[in-house]
């Protein structure tokens, strides 16, 4: 538990509230029973009984439940007896000066004799306070710790007068501060999301499609939703920064239908089948140990009487909210509501509930705030109530079947008391039009005052289709979503075409989109004096300093720069050695003529020299020196091109007058000097610095001006939590060029033993197993909070230049961007893979289009290709995406306004982009990217205009690296006329229309630029 943080300010503030109430003469006498001390014992964690006064006190004061802990409250001191590890967390509470009471921490070890002395010390403290001890008698505790305490306390228990102090604590817990209200509000948001976004959709599906499911199974299905993190991270839920690790159910959801209803909070879901008449559902979540509750009634084909009763219930609840305000007496509220029923609907009085709810907070049901006619308590601003209003055992005069004879109506909401109208935290839809479902084609059953339902829109819960006649609502939604996506893609394609024509309009850009290589001048020596002294020997010299080869030609030394040398070869023939030097010149067979510019290609060039010598060892050494120098020159040129975009950042402006914001014990990728050691990150004025522990000058500086993206990825489903920086321009880290720098910490399975500071691994199966598992979850949550908070500080320090981005795991899909199958996760601005190296960061607003390849029936995977707006950038391929995720990928691309096309085959994008770059204006004038969406031959399109200008190959992707000679021979064979396969097709008896179609396709292919020669002709 070493990762927990105890808020000492909150602790002492709330402890002061408790002591003030306790010392108050009236409260001390009536609520605390004049007790002189309060004894609170908590044993092992009990999931079956989470709502107890003792654990509520722990949560309220400390922020957490501390199992195996004893607290003794006195009016001048609080004593806490707990394990060593927990005690270390609480030590700072005792160091606070000017607190309302002293804090005394006692550390319990595994020494039984020492623990016995500590228990006896607690008893001595109690004896010194007049022996009247306040306890919480309804709490049930168990475990080894409780057994040890009872063995000491039970023999002397008769000495003390034990009184019930529950009401005193309840008053202190009743009024919530801002932090507590925020927790209840967060829990309520989740409850509303599950009710309106999950339960309603599932309920409508079951009823609409006539599927059978029991109440208990439906309830279990909802309860398991808490493990579905993707659902809670859906943007449409608008849950904000809810920490899912702090979320839990208050109780198993209660679902009732089919004539059997129980409106009590203690109701249990039965095993009867779900029935489409009147369905009641109530559920509640706890967030950071604070509860919420919401309940709704859903009506299926209701008659006019049911609608009338429900409308009255909604109006009654509205009045109930009006009565609940600061200063109102709880008993009077119930009496007023009952008076309204007697005045307007006396027939419903026997069916009205006996109480209208209770207080809610750390405890799900604060019984001291029970809303009934007998409670004299006065409501105060800051209190929170769980209001439950309803009518039970109602008789349906026109039942459709035996299960519809009786029904009930129920509304439950969580509210905050204010000085005016209360704040309703659970604003799930409850109007008549939102909860009524009609299967009939006409609306004759509607009462006059209720308007017919509008056609359902996306996200509504209404079932308006006729059962057995039309398709289900889900199918309709899918079809409408597909139509909307297709229409949106057409708009995006038109926009891309217009942007391309405008971007490459005549005169706005050079006619060629390819940057032409420039002529490089090499000068070996500026003057004769720089030549080596050995030139007088008229031998072949290799001058490393000048990067030149000096050749004796007609008795004169002639230098040739190494860059002019193409290759060298050595042959032994008899007693002589032949050294041949081939030089670069235009027009060479197999040469890359376009990449080798010359000042005057029509000038005369020396292509080769051949030297003969009888000195074998000398020529061998010369040949080796030439080879080595050529390799070194080639390596330098490669490195120059590779590091051409590497920049040298400005200097980091450090914060000198104080310790900058920092985070410790983080690793960096790429590692400095190849050594994996934890360091720390500091935030300075114009950037951040990662400092290695090796030496002071071993660090990485990242300036805000060079940061392009900042990501935080939580450790959910991962082994690390990380902060990732994607740079605008690469930098050098050690000897490596990098554009991505990542800081991370591993989520290990190591914890500290509570009896010391030695690390030990989990020992699953011992008595602390549940506590340790909970410890691991909380450790992960703590890591997420720590890293996210630091990432937010980085974004804040950048003064708006960068924004923090977090991956959406619910939108993730698997794919292979490099060699490994990884999980790619969209963010607001990017598509990323940050867990494994090499990293993937694709900026969405730099994408021109996307192309889905190998999309055809029978294949299990498809590929995704991104083409960038900068056509000189090579496209990025993400291969082997499961076909099950095709619709999700399409929906994501469409939601990001990315125009995409799909096709059945892989395209040769190297050839395509080369053609596009050669003349981008002509490309867009001839239709641009529209060729990707043109129908293929097997779809039966006979129009010449629709023929794709690029022909896809069904060959293996590895075939894209074929020799040029093979491509030329294939071109020639196709230009000569029909291929052999076509001749065979003709002989097999094709009709004239088929032959004419092929001829038109062949002409169109040769008139336009093509992808690459295909070994087979596709039909």
UniProtKB/Swiss-Prot annotation:
Domain of life according to the entry: Eukaryota
Residues in coiled coil: 767-799
Entry keywords, A to Z: Chromosome, Coiled coil, DNA damage, DNA repair, DNA replication, Nucleus, Phosphoprotein, Transcription, Transcription regulation
InterPro entries associated with the record: Creatin/AminoP/Spt16_N, Creatinase/aminopeptidase-like, FACT-SPT16_Nlobe, Fact-SPT16_PH, FACT_SPT16_C, FACT_SPT16_M, Pept_M24, PH-like_dom_sf
Chief localisation class: nucleus
Residue ranges of the region described as Disordered: 443-515, 930-1019
Localization per Swiss-Prot or TrEMBL: Nucleus; Chromosome
Gene Ontology BP terms: chromatin organization; constitutive heterochromatin formation; DNA repair; DNA replication; DNA replication-dependent chromatin assembly; nucleosome organization; transcription elongation by RNA polymerase II; transcription elongation-coupled chromatin remodeling
GO cellular-component term (any): FACT complex
GO molecular function, one term: histone chaperone activity
Acidic residues bias (residue ranges): 936-994
Pfam families: FACT-Spt16_Nlob (PF14826), Peptidase_M24 (PF00557), PH_SPT16 (PF24824), Rttp106-like_middle (PF08512), SPT16 (PF08644), SPT16_C (PF21091)
Compositionally biased spans, kind Basic and acidic residues: 470-490, 995-1013
Record SUPFAM superfamilies: Creatinase/aminopeptidase
Record SMART domains: FACT-Spt16_Nlob, Rtt106, SPT16
Keyword DNA repair recorded: yes
Residue numbers carrying Phosphoserine: 444-445
Record-linked PANTHER family: CDC68 RELATED, FACT COMPLEX SUBUNIT SPT16
Function, in words: Component of the FACT complex, a general chromatin factor that acts to reorganize nucleosomes. The FACT complex is involved in multiple processes that require DNA as a template such as mRNA elongation, DNA replication and DNA repair. During transcription elongation the FACT complex acts as a histone chaperone that both destabilizes and restores nucleosomal structure.
Subunit and partners: Forms a stable heterodimer with pob3. The spt16-pob3 dimer weakly associates with multiple molecules of nhp6 to form the FACT complex. Interacts with abo1.
Protein family according to the UniProt entry: Belongs to the peptidase M24 family. SPT16 subfamily.
Name of the protein in its database record: FACT complex subunit spt16
Organism: Schizosaccharomyces pombe (strain 972 / ATCC 24843) (Fission yeast)
């Amino acid at each position: 538990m070493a990762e927990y943080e105890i808020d000492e300010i909150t602790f002492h503030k709330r402890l002061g509230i408790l002591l003030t109430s306790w010392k108050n003469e009236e409260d001390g006498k009536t609520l605390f029973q004049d007790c002189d001390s309060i004894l609170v014992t908590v044993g092992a964690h009990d999931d079956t009984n989470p709502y107890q006064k003792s654990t509520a006190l722990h949560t309220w004061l400390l922020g957490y439940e501390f199992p195996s802990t004893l607290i003794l409250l006195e009016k001048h001191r609080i004593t806490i007896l707990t394990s060593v590890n927990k005690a270390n967390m609480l030590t700072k509470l005792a160091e606070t000066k000017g607190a309302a009471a002293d804090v005394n921490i006692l550390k319990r070890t595994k020494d039984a004799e020492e623990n016995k002395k500590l228990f006896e010390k607690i008893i001595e403290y109690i004896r010194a306070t007049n022996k009247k001890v306040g306890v919480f008698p309804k709490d049930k505790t168990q475990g080894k710790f409780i057994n040890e305490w009872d063995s000491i306390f039970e023999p002397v228990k008769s000495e003390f007068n034990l009184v019930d102090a529950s009401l005193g604590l309840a008053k202190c817990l009743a009024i919530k501060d801002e932090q507590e209200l925020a927790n209840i509000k967060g829990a309520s948001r989740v409850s509303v999301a599950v009710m309106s976004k999950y339960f309603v959709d599932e309920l409508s599906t079951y009823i609409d499609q006539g599927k059978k499911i029991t109440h208990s199974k439906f309830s279990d299905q909802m309860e398991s939703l808490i493990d579905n993190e993707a659902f809670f991270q859906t943007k449409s839920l608008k849950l904000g920064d809810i920490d899912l690790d702090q979320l839990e159910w208050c109780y198993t959801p209660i679902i009732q239908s089919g004539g059997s209803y129980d409106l009590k909070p203690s109701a249990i879901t039965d095993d009867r089948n779900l029935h489409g008449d009147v369905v009641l559902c109530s559920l509640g979540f706890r967030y950071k140990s604070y509860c919420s509750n919401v309940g709704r009634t859903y009506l299926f084909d209701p008659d006019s009487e049911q609608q009338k009763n429900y409308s009255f219930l909604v109006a009654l609840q509205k009045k109930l909210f009006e009565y609940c305000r600061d200063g109102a007496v709880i008993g009077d509220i119930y009496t007023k509501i009952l008076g309204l029923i007697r005045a307007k609907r006396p027939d419903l009085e026997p069916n009205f509930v006996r109480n209208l709810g209770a207080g809610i907070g750390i405890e799900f049901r604060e019984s001291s705030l029970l809303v009934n006619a007998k409670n004299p308590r006065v409501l105060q601003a800051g209190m929170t109530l769980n209001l439950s209003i309803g009518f039970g055992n109602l008789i349906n005069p026109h039942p459709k079947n035996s299960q519809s004879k009786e029904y009930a109506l129920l509304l439950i909401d969580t509210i905050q008391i204010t000085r005016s109208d209360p704040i309703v935290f659970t604003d799930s839809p409850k109007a008549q039009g939102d909860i009524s479902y009609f299967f009939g084609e006409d609306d004759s059953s509607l009462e006059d005052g209720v308007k017919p339902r509008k056609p359902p829109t996306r996200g509504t819960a209404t079932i308006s289709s006729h059962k057995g006649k039309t398709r289900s609502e889900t199918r309709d939604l899918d079809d409408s979503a597909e139509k909307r996506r297709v229409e949106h893609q057409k708009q995006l394609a038109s926009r891309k075409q217009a942007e391309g024509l405008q971007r490459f309009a005549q005169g706005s850009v050079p006619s060629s989109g390819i940057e032409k290589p420039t002529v490089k001048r090499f000068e070996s020596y500026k003057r004769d004096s720089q030549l080596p002294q050995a030139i007088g020997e008229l031998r072949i010299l290799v001058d490393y300093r000048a990067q030149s080869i000096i050749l004796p030609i007609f008795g004169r030394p002639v230098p040739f720069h190494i860059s002019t040398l193409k290759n060298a070869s050595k042959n032994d023939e008899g007693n002589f050695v032949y050294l041949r030097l081939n030089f670069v010149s235009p027009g060479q067979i197999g040469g890359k003529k376009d990449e080798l510019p010359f000042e005057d290609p029509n000038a005369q060039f020396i292509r080769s020299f051949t030297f003969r010598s009888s000195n074998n060892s000398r020529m061998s050494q010369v040949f080796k020196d030439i080879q080595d120098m050529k390799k070194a020159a080639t390596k330098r040129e490669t490195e120059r091109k590779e590091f051409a975009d590497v920049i040298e950042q400005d200097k980091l402006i450090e914060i000198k007058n104080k310790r900058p914001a920092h985070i410790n014990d983080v690793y960096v990728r790429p590692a400095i000097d190849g050594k994996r050691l934890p360091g720390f990150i500091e935030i300075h004025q114009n950037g951040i610095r990662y400092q290695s522990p090796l030496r002071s000058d071993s660090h990485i500086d990242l300036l805000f001006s060079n940061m392009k993206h900042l990501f935080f990825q939580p450790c959910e489903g991962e082994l690390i939590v990380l902060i990732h920086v994607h740079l605008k321009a690469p930098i050098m880290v050690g000897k490596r060029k990098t554009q991505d720098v990542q800081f991370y910490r591993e989520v290990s399975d190591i914890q500290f033993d509570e009896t010391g500071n030695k690390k030990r691994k989990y020992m699953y199966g011992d008595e602390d197993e549940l506590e340790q598992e909970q410890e691991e979850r909380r450790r992960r949550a703590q890591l997420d909070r720590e890293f996210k908070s630091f990432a937010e500080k980085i974004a804040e320090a950048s003064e708006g230049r960068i924004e923090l981005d977090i991956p959406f795991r619910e939108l993730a899909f698997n794919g292979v961007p490099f060699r490994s199958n990884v999980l790619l996760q969209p963010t607001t601005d990017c598509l990323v893979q940050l867990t494994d190296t090499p990293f993937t960061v694709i900026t969405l607003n730099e994408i021109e289009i996307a192309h889905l390849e190998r999309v055809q029936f029978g294949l299990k995977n498809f590929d995704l290709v991104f083409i960038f707006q900068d056509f000189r950038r090579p496209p990025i391929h993400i291969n082997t995406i499961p076909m099950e995720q095709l619709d999700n990928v399409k929906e994501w691309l469409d939601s990001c306004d990315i125009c995409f096309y799909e096709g059945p085959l892989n395209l040769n994008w190297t050839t395509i982009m080369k053609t596009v770059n050669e003349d981008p204006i002509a490309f867009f004038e001839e239709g641009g990217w529209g060729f990707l969406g043109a129908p293929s031959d097997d779809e039966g399109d006979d129009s010449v205009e629709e023929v794709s200008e690029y022909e896809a190959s069904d060959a293996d992707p590895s075939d894209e690296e074929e020799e040029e000679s093979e491509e030329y021979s294939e071109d020639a064979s196709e230009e000569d006329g029909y291929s052999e396969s076509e001749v065979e097709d003709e002989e097999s008896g094709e009709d004239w229309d088929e032959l004419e179609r092929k001829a038109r396709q062949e002409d169109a292919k040769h008139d336009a630029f093509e992808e690459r020669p295909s070994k087979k002709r596709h039909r």
